[in-house]
């Protein structure tokens, strides 16, 4: 498919209107798309992303997020190291707040999240609350202006040697709220939240194996292993840890 919103608000509303002509809204549970998608000019690289992975990509590429006031989805573009152009679309807590406001006014039977673990954690500030017009004044949206750094780990590249690039830091967001409709009409990521970001190094070429020998060196077996490696011209390196490195 072509790059585009994960869950456009108007598309959602149209689909709910359509199904509600056949099924009572009281029996409809609306699925919330809490993830993103990274489209590349190289289609083999197209992949789904979590909220935090999308934010990390935007931060790494110094991209500016665009919050579309028509779809309520976010997007940005960047180029990878091979000069492929990527277009990323994803949802966050503001997107899902607006969708849940719609669901509560319809009213639908409820909502479900797709998928747990990929969501913007700020949604838990309001997910289990009544977001109907009669109750919305009681909902404090101030917590949505701060995004806590995540303890999950985002890995970059491949290999067994790890380099920590970033640790969790909180982000700051400015919101614009329509007081009449009680929805979020715009948001600006002033600073991006970060998670643990780890660069992997040492990826082996195709059809190449890396053998590891644990619990050494051993005075009997290590020389035998080295003799076999030498005979077959296999390069080797020692990583000494624990007591053996002292």
Regions found by a protein language model. Give the residues of each.
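Glycan-binding loop/region signatures in secreted carbohydrate-active enzymes
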Residues: 27-101, 128-135
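C-terminal/domain-terminus segments
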Residues: 99-138
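Generic structural signal for well-ordered alpha-helices
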Residues: 9-20, 100, 124-128, 226
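A structural motif corresponding to the C-terminal end of an alpha-helix
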Residues: 15-28, 99-109, 232
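Conserved, mostly hydrophobic/aromatic
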Residues: 30, 103, 111, 214, ...
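N-terminal pre-catalytic segment of deacetylase/amide-hydrolase enzymes
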Residues: 134-211, 218-223, 231
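Aromatic- and acid-rich polysaccharide-binding/catalytic face
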Residues: 1-6
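Short, well-structured secondary-structure segments
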Residues: 210-211, 226-246
């Amino acid at each position: 498919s072509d790059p585009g919103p994960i869950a456009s608000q108007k598309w959602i509303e149209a689909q709910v209107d359509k199904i509600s002509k056949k099924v009572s809204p009281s029996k409809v549970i609306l699925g919330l798309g809490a993830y993103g998608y990274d489209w590349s000019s190289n289609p083999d690289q197209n992949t789904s992303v979590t909220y935090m992975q999308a934010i990390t990509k935007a931060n790494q590429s110094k991209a500016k997020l665009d919050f579309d006031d028509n779809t309520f989805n976010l997007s940005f573009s960047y180029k990878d190291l091979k000069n492929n152009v990527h277009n990323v679309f994803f949802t966050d807590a503001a997107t899902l707040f607006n969708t849940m406001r719609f669901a509560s006014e319809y009213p639908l039977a409820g909502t479900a999240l797709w998928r747990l673990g990929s969501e913007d954690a700020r949604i838990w500030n309001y997910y289990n609350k009544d977001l109907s017009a009669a109750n919305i004044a009681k909902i404090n949206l101030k917590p949505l202006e701060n995004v806590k750094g995540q303890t999950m780990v985002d890995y970059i590249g491949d290999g067994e040697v790890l380099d920590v690039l970033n640790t969790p830091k909180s982000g700051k967001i400015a919101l614009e709220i329509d007081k009449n409709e009680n929805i979020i009409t715009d948001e600006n990521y002033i600073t991006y939240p970060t998670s643990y970001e780890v660069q992997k190094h040492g990826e082996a070429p195709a059809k190449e194996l890396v053998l590891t020998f644990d619990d050494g060196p051993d005075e009997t077996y290590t020389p035998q292993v080295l003799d076999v490696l030498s005979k077959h011209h296999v390069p080797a390196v020692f990583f000494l840890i624990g007591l053996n490195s002292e």
